[in-house]
């Protein structure tokens, strides 16, 4: 069969798209809410020319924040409720997490969120250059085996397009409880054009002042792992 999008780059995707069966209510949230929360034409089938999203039209000129891999959506909804004058795009390929987020959005009544249920690289394709004012990468999949480290988010394949999408001076927050992920983050993120802002140990040992702890973080703490909270800033040219 001929590829309808011959210019589409080959991108391996690792990880699950779906886990356990969704509840009836979650299926309803997906059917009723997901399309309304789209940030715009992201998928190749609807935007084969990779035309940049019109974020001003979609969000009314608000600052744009981005969370890559929002899990169950606790942090995303918290930030949306705390920052109503900001528009936040959440990207998550795991449909169970997306369904959980939609339930939280309904419960919280927030109206400044958009959701892309797919690969962040496809979203990066169509984010306008310099459009993102703040980005979050919180407890990403650690891919603990050495041969799988290239699958981690903190690689050139992800960091370069993220850097392009962020405005000069924009903040990039990374949280992880995996020591080797800290190491790779500290090696790769500065090389991609970001400056680490820590001045004291407390800057990475203590969470941000607007932080809300997630289910994953609570599990990590119960199991004796130590969270690290790293703050970077896109260097100005």
Swiss-Prot record:
GO molecular function annotation:
tRNA (guanine(46)-N7)-methyltransferase activity
Kindly state which reaction or reactions the protein catalyses: guanosine(46) in tRNA + S-adenosyl-L-methionine = N(7)-methylguanosine(46) in tRNA + S-adenosyl-L-homocysteine
Say which enzyme class the record assigns: transferase
Q: In which pathway does it act?
A: tRNA modification; N(7)-methylguanine-tRNA biosynthesis
Residues at the active site? 141
Query: GO terms for CC?
Result: tRNA methyltransferase complex
User: What biological function has been recorded for the protein in this entry?
Assistant: Catalyzes the formation of N(7)-methylguanine at position 46 (m7G46) in tRNA.
Q: What is this protein called?
A: tRNA (guanine-N(7)-)-methyltransferase
Species whose genome carries this gene: Jannaschia sp. (strain CCS1)
The lineage is: Bacteria, Pseudomonadati, Pseudomonadota, Alphaproteobacteria, Rhodobacterales
Q: Its encoding gene is what?
A: trmB
């Amino acid at each position: 069969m001929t590829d309808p999008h011959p210019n589409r780059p080959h991108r391996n995707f690792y990880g699950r798209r779906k886990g356990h069966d969704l509840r009836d209510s979650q299926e309803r949230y997906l059917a009723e809410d997901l399309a309304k929360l789209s940030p715009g034409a992201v998928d190749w089938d609807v935007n084969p020319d990779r035309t940049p999203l019109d974020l001003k039209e979609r969000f009314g000129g608000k600052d744009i924040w981005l969370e890559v891999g929002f899990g169950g959506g606790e942090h995303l909804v918290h930030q949306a409720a705390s920052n109503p004058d900001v528009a936040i795009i959440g990207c998550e390929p795991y449909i169970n997490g997306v369904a959980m987020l939609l339930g939280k959005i309904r419960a919280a009544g927030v109206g400044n969120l958009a959701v892309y249920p797919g690969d962040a690289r496809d979203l990066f394709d169509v984010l306008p250059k310099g459009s993102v004012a703040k980005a979050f990468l919180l407890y990403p999949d650690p891919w603990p085996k050495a041969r799988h480290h290239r699958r981690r988010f903190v690689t050139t394949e992800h960091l370069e397009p993220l850097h392009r999408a962020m405005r000069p001076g924009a903040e990039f927050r990374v949280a992880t409880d995996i020591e080797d992920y800290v190491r790779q983050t500290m090696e790769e993120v500065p090389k991609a054009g970001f400056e680490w802002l820590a001045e004291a140990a407390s800057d990475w040992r203590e969470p941000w002042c607007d932080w809300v702890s997630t289910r994953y973080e609570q599990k990590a703490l119960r199991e004796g792992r130590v969270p690290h909270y790293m703050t970077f800033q896109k260097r100005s040219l």
